[in-house]
Amino acid sequence: MFSAETYKQRRAELARRIGNGLILISGNTLSPFNYPNNTYSFRQDSTFLYYFGLNIPSLMAVLDAESGEAILFGDDFTVEDIIWTGPQPRLVELGAQVGVSNCQPLKALDGVVATAMKQNRRIHFLPPYRGESKIELSRLLGLPLSALYPHKSVDLMFAVAEMREVKSAEEIEALERAFQLGYAMHTTAMKMCKAGVVEREIAGAMEGIAKSQGLGVSFPSIVSQHGETLHNLNSDGVLENGRLLLVDGGAESLENYCSDHTRTYQIGRASCRERVFSRV
């Protein structure tokens, strides 16, 4: 997480670019793996992280593009929650970490959105990609699920993209850390690239590096001798001399910045022809 001032400056610039209406930014929720209390590893929405910095599930935020005021919505952990999670900071404490003083319960978001809609103010939102987010936006805005994409804010899409494509010095440092993790993953894969090794052994070693020094892989690693198949996630092949191994993998740094490297490695001794191509 960066300083509170960083997030305040980002929100102020976003409000300036949009200029009118309310900007609704949805955080992600926990998603069940195979039953409600067993969830996938949590990954916060990247736009929420960029403007509000909190890597915690079930948060929502509104930014008034006219006044510049930001409101953070969420619920404090209950006693039942704390049994499982241990003591957690209150919402107002989380808000202070990212420069937001107006923190309200999640249910208060309904009233804020309803009031804005009665005033015919535009509600800007990005096209959602998770089912849970689609359902919540549909409920909040009174739109059928099929109408969410047509009602997306193109202005907001361009504003967010234009801001995020220019990286600050502290972001570049975070990207460098993600790059170094990716480098360690790929050099490990290169050293393991020997006949008889199972592809998943290499994939597992790479994931272990990403998890031990960062937040894990930035996407499911592709480790396959069948590089002709795009996004081949099957890693059950046994490495054979003379074959080529495609390795597409990257890591997510502790600051949620990601690397993505793709390399092809020779299994066994390279032929003269292969050595020529490797120098190109």
What positions do the PLM features span?
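Active-site neighborhoods and metal-handling regions in enzymes and metal-associated proteins
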Residues: 1-278
